[in-house]
Amino acid sequence: MISNVINQIDAIAQNTGDLIAYDELGRTHTYAQLKSGSDSLAAHIDSLNLPTGAPIMVYGGQQFEMIASFLGSTKSGHAYIPVDKSSADERLTDILEIGKPALVIAVDELPIEITSVPVIDPKALTSIFDNETSYQITHPVEGDDNFYIIFTSGTTGKPKGVQISHRNLISFADWMLSDDFNWPEKSQVLSQPPYSFDLSVMDWAPALLSSSTLKALPKETADDFKTLFATLPKLDLNIWVSTPSFADVALLDPNFTQENLPQLTHFLFCGEVLTSTTAQKLLSRFPNATVYNTYGPTEATVAVSGLPITEAVIATNDKMPIGYVKSDTTIKIQDPDGQDVPAGETGEIVICGPSVSKGYLNNPEKTAQAFKQIDGHQAYKTGDLATMDSSGLLHYRGRSDFQIKLHGFRIELEEVAQQLQQSHFVAQAAAVPRYDDEGKVKQLLAVIVASDNSFEKPMQLTNAIKDELKDIMMPYMVPGRFIYREAMPLTPNGKIDLKGLIAEVNGDA
């Protein structure tokens, strides 16, 4: 059991300081350097006399200095707000306005001028890290203090800052390092999701708490397929953490196999639906690896349920289940009135437990809408639909806000995409609606990245896909039009950009 995140990482630095904590394509830093840098930064932050507990924004990409800044902030008693360097200027401005940070640490050069709060620019930050300082931790983030605040994109309007406490983080990290995942110590762990996406916590937290090495994959490398495919085998990975969409990109390379990545033993997925197609490809190509599907919203600290996906699971489930809830947490499946539904019936996932956030920063109205108390414990209403069978296994049924109605039929977009991917002609798929002038759905479209094939015309490929799926898909779920692309657009978080595709097909992009 972890009692204190900061102390445990520092203890590794004191006992085995020469271990590599961070490897950014050969630019390495040890645990001793992580402690030294974060200590020096914490001492500097203390000297600024910032308001007690006020958050600190940390801006940058996949760099060691980001992690060191996170730890330096929390050692000095301040939560950090991670902001990725690929963020739009407007998002940066929104986060400054809503989050009200007392300080901005710029690991990379800021794209806008910030005058409302003090800024530590990259040059000054380097000087602080180089100025080794002995630091005594006396007022760190602990207990219910916020450890980090991650801003979600939100379905509409301004982003919301999800507050995650030290206690929330420990609940998650303890689970990741439990027997449920058999996370080996001193592993080589892929660090690909941006730190502004809470999936990144699934790599850095258990890695740094288990004497492991984070193998950073900068966005520039991940976005260039040729460079990505050449880089992955050189990382000597043991543990892979990403969205399923990023794994689908890697699977486009026929050399992404156990033979070329022999030490890879764990795939951990979260953030979007894992299809049976993707899971089967991974099991076939990596026979020595275990594929874990996990589920959870940012508001409940990354993930709260999971299970290993085996051949037996694939054979007995049309869609990949999202697992069993972790032992310190309760999941209820409820109707719109907040009443529990019978086992096997669809309802909203409501999460109750020690990893549930206290709410949205400086946004009591949205907090009151999404959070509630159940038997004296904090609970979060996810907006995700699921069923729970008699064994406690959760089966995801989609987002309540990604359902459409076409010709009187209710259609779940993610379900259509999953069924499309069962065709061996389809590498990746998304289903998107086209609306008429009155906002009513008039057509369902499929956006496809095709597998290698010998068809000369798109119509031949479309007919072949439809023929393969005619016994799987209900006729009303078959898209009326198929659009083919070389690659799917992804959000900065590595998920398929479904909202962007919807805007594109409706002429709003």
Feature locations, PLM:
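Conserved AMP-binding
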Residues: 60-63, 84, 193-197, 220, ...
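Conserved AMP-binding/adenylation subdomain of ANL enzymes
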Residues: 160-190, 198-238
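AMP-binding/adenylate-forming domain of the ANL superfamily
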Residues: 1-149, 164, 275-279, 327-330, ...
